[in-house]
Swiss-Prot record:
Designated name of the protein: Caveolae-associated protein 1
Annotated source species: Rattus norvegicus (Rat)
Tissue specificity field: Expressed in the adipocyte (at protein level). Expressed in all striated and smooth muscles tested including diaphragm, esophageal striated muscle, fibroblast, endocardial endothelium, epicardial mesothelium, intestinal smooth muscle, masseter, soleus muscle, vascular smooth muscle and white gastrocnemius muscle (at protein level). Expressed in the endothelium and perineural sheath (at protein level). Not expressed in hepatocytes.
InterPro entries, per database record: Cavin_fam
Localization of this protein: Membrane, Caveola; Cell membrane; Microsome; Endoplasmic reticulum
Chain residue ranges for the region called Nuclear localization signal: 138-154, 235-251
Entry-linked PANTHER family: CAVEOLAE-ASSOCIATED PROTEIN 1 (PTHR15240:SF3), CAVIN (PTHR15240)
Glycyl lysine isopeptide (Lys-Gly) (interchain with G-Cter in SUMO1) cross-link site: K163
Region Leucine-zipper 2, annotated ranges: 168-188
Region: Leucine-zipper 1, residue numbers: 55-77
Post-translational modification: Phosphorylated. Present in active and inactive forms. Changes in phosphorylation pattern may alter activity. Phosphorylation at Tyr-158 is essential for its function in the regulation of ribosomal transcriptional activity.
């Protein structure tokens, strides 16, 4: 709006003397002289009044236009303020949703931590039981070594089948043959019985002595044979081959149990790693992890003032509705050299060694394998120990 200078000339009223004029009052002669040119002065005053009115009208028009513009800008500002209020309300709603999601995630994380604690407690108990079993196995090995060194076994041998000599069987056959004619004699008449009875008594008395002698001889031979058999059985039981076989069996059983426990621990470790990776990806996505990594690197650099500064050019976008600003940031520094990664072949032996070391480190660090698998391991080890004791 342009600055306009407004000059207003006031018209003096007739009959009042001009206050600004100084000096004595005019004489009647001078008054007459001044009254003559009054017509020309009045015309000039009328023209100046018209000019002043036109200027006032133009100024009023400009003021009205400026007021209209101010009203329009005020209406636009009100619309923008309403839009900003809507955006703020939407942001508040999103923030409330984010707070609810954060609360739910915190609850899930707390539950997961409780489960992990329970699993760690169960793992500690199972580990204690496994250590006890290992101690018992060591004690058994020590006892076995001492027994092998002393050779103080007490072996009970039971013989079910007892072979009788041939003479005793002959005497039994003779007794049976004697019993048969006695039964036939009962069927015969009374007159014939006394003679046959006498003959039978004579035969039985002669053969009884022979049977007693045969029985005594057979008992002595049987005792000798049983003693010889027992000695042979003891020799076989305490032979070096038998002891070596028992040692080999015990070692094989122990190796089998160790291999089974290692395999089960590796399986549980793999399953737990998969579950933890799945939970980690659910809780923290990959993009979030990368952002956290970059923020950690930035914090580390900020705490180390002597770090190397690399040159970079970055474009950032800032959105302030209804405008979008593209800002390009250029930083001077050294050229960053990317390190090339080398691929190394890994053999099967290296994989096995790495798996064994990983399992050992997981056990030392207190990794939490599955409880059911560990209980199955303990049951299998108990079954192997029972089989070993039965075989011994």
């Amino acid at each position: 709006m342009e600055d306009v200078t407004l000059h207003i000339v006031e018209r003096p009223y007739s009959g009042y003397p001009d206050a600004s004029s100084e000096g004595p009052e005019p004489t009647p002669g001078e008054a007459r002289a001044t009254e003559e040119p009054s017509g020309t002065g009045s015309d000039e005053l009328i023209k100046s009044d018209q000019v002043n009115g036109v200027l006032v009208l133009s100024l009023l028009d400009k003021i009205i236009g400026a007021v209209d513009q101010i009203q329009l800008t005020q209406a636009q500002l009100e619309e923008r303020q309403a839009e900003m209020e809507g955006a703020v309300q939407s942001i508040q709603g999103e923030l409330s949703k984010l707070g609810k999601a954060h609360a739910t995630t915190s609850n899930t994380v707390s539950k997961l931590l409780e489960k992990v604690r329970k699993v760690s407690v169960n793992v500690k108990t199972v580990r204690g039981s496994l250590e006890r079993q290992a101690g018992q196995i060591k004690k058994l090995e020590v006892n076995e070594a001492e027994l092998l060194r002393r050779r103080n076994f007490k072996v009970m041998i039971y013989q079910d089948e007892v072979k009788l000599p041939a003479k005793l069987s002959v005497s039994k056959s003779l007794k049976e043959s004697e019993a048969l004619p006695e039964k036939e004699g009962d069927e015969l008449g009374e007159g014939e019985r006394p003679e046959e009875d006498a003959a039978a008594i004579e035969l039985s008395s002669d053969e009884a002595v022979e049977v007693e002698e045969v029985i005594e001889e057979s008992r002595a031979e049987r005792i000798k044979r049983s003693g010889l058999r027992r000695v042979d059985d003891f020799k076989k039981a305490f032979s070096k081959e038998k002891m070596e076989k028992t040692k080999v069996r015990t070692r094989e059983n122990l190796e089998k149990t160790r291999l089974k426990t290692k395999e089960n621990l590796e399986k549980t470790r793999h399953t737990l790693e998969k579950r933890m990776n799945k939970l980690g990806t659910r809780l923290v996505p990959v993009e979030r992890r990368e952002k956290l990594k970059t923020s950690r690197d930035k914090l580390r650099k900020s705490f180390t003032p002597d770090h190397v500064v690399y040159a970079r050019s970055k474009t950032a976008v800032y959105k302030v509705p209804p405008f979008t600003f593209h800002v390009k940031k250029i930083r001077e520094g050294e050229v960053e050299v990317l390190k090339a990664t080398e691929m190394v072949e890994v053999g099967p032996d290296d994989d096995e060694v790495g798996a064994e070391r990983g399992a050992e480190t997981d056990l030392l660090r207190g990794s939490s394998p599955d409880v059911h698998t560990l209980l199955e391991i303990t049951e299998e080890s108990d079954a192997v120990l029972v089989d070993k004791s039965d075989s011994d």
